[in-house]
Amino acid sequence: MDRYPITGRSLEWFFDIDGDLFERQYKRHLSGYRQWKDTPEGLHAGQWRVFPQNIGPHLSIDETSLSRGELYTIVTNKEAHGRKHSIVAIVLGTDSDVVLRALRQIKSELRNKVKEITLDLSESMHRICRLAFPKASRVIDRFHLQRLALDAVQEIRIKHRWDAINADTDGRESAKIEGRKYVAERLENGDTLKELLARGRYALFKSPEKWTVSQRQRAGMLFRLYPDLKEAYRLSQNLRTIFNRRSTKDCARLNLARWYNSVAQAGFKSFNTIAATFYEHADEI
C-alpha cells in the first residue's frame, strides 16, 4: 500500500472504515497539504517542481506536451535512463526566464558540477543552459537534426500533394460544367495521385530497409513521378548514414562537408537552411 496509489474505498473491507471519509481526512489533515502549499516549494508547485537530489554530470533538456497540449520544459538526468530519480526539474511553459528562475532553486555548487547537457536547436534552450549550467558543454541531439531533414522532405511531398488536390478539383469542376462523370486516373497500385502523395508519407519517414512491400512500391512510384522528392529523400538518408556511422570527429566533418556540397548542388531552400544551421552549430553537434 505504501508503494502504489490506491483509493480510500479499497481500504474499507480491510479496516472497516468509510473510504470517502478517510480520503477527505487524509487530504485535509493527514497529508499536510494545506501546510505544504504555503511553503516556498509549495507556492510554485503549479509552475515548477525541482529535485536537486537528482542532478548529475550529464543532463538533458527538452520540451514536451503532457496534458491538453500544454508544453512543459523538462530537465532530466541521463544516467537514470528514464527510471526513478530521472527528473531534475519540470517547468510549465518554455519561457527561459521562468525556467531559469526554477533551476536557480538548485544551489550553484551543484549546477556547476554538470559537465554536459543535451538540447535541441532552440535559442531559448541555449540561453537556459548557458546561464544555468555555465561550466557544462552543450551537445545538440542528432535526432533533432535528422527531424529537420525529414520535415524538409515532407515539405516537398506536401507541395506536390496540394498541386494534385488542386488539379483534381479543377478536373471535377470541368466535368460538372461539361455534364460528364468525373473519373480520377488511378495508378498501377490503385491509388489516385493525391492518394499516393498522402499515403506515401509513411515511407518517406523510414529508411529503405524498413519499408514494407506496399511502401516500397509507393516510394518507387513517388520517386519516378517526382525526381525532386527522390533527391530530397536521398539527402535525408545520407545525413542519417553520417550520424549512424561510427567515425572520428574529423572524418564526420569531412562527410558533412561532402553532404553540404550535395545540398548546394540540389538547390533545395529548406536543405540549404539546414546546412547553414549545421555549420553554425558544428562544434555542438
Residue spans for each PLM region:
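Inter-helix linker motif
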Residues: 135-151
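Short, basic interhelical loop/turn and adjoining N-cap
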Residues: 6-25
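Short, surface-exposed amphipathic charged segments that create phosphate/polyanion-binding patches used
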Residues: 150-162
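RNase H-like nuclease fold core
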Residues: 21-118, 123-128
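Acidic/histidine-rich catalytic cores and adjacent linkers
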Residues: 8, 68-69, 78-84, 100-104, ...
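Short amphipathic alpha-helical surface patches that mediate protein-protein
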Residues: 16, 27, 276-279
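Short, conserved catalytic/metal-binding motifs centered on acidic residues
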Residues: 1, 11, 59-64, 117-120, ...
